[in-house]
Amino acid sequence: MKKNNSPSTTSRMIKIEASDGRGKFSAYLAKPASGKGPGLVIAQEIFGVNVSMRQIADYYAEEGYIVLVPDLFWRQKPGVQLGYTPEDWQKAFEFYQGFDEDLGVQDIQDTITTLREIKGCTGDVGVLGFCLGGKLAYLSACRTDVDVAIGYYGVGIENALKEAEDIECRLVLHIAGLDKYCPHEAQEKIKKRLGKYEGLDVYVYPDADHAFARPNGEHYHKPSALMAHQRSIAALRE
């Protein structure tokens, strides 16, 4: 097993069998030193399972979670790991435009199922996603058997609000007030629709932009990121 940068966690790549029979996809597995804990699926941004996503997984492993980060672009190209240069942004949007959302949620369900079967997992599993993964976290709450879902600056949630009536788990959404990918009108629509459901919380961070929780990112906003993290951890521990 590979040691990552944290002495208190271990990590390696594993394979997950897709339930539609189309093959296997990779996932980054990070475990706490104890090897035991609740499960957490990290749903990627549009840049693939890159260094940022793996670092987030390692961080939550340090917090005591067994974490899986599935390669959700595998049906287009396995192993996508992009940076944040203009060229990488262009490639990322191409993958995003070619992404099948329904199959992505199916892959997340397969990841949840796999995670529950990993030795040391308590059986409780959450989904936490960013950007593209933020919407997938919301859809996971609507369509999968996850125990809690947390979405950071999800894109397009306002177009899937009818599915909210199917949510049976805890859901927390973190919205960046300055996010051009989720403008004010969309934010209001989300708050109005989801605000009437118990156990569904929508938080708007007025001074934050898209990707405000990505450390070292252009739009990283520490006060908002810390507050969102505290709320996320609280929801995961309920």
PLM regions with names:
Residues 1-238:
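N-terminal cap/leader regions of alpha/beta-hydrolase-fold enzymes
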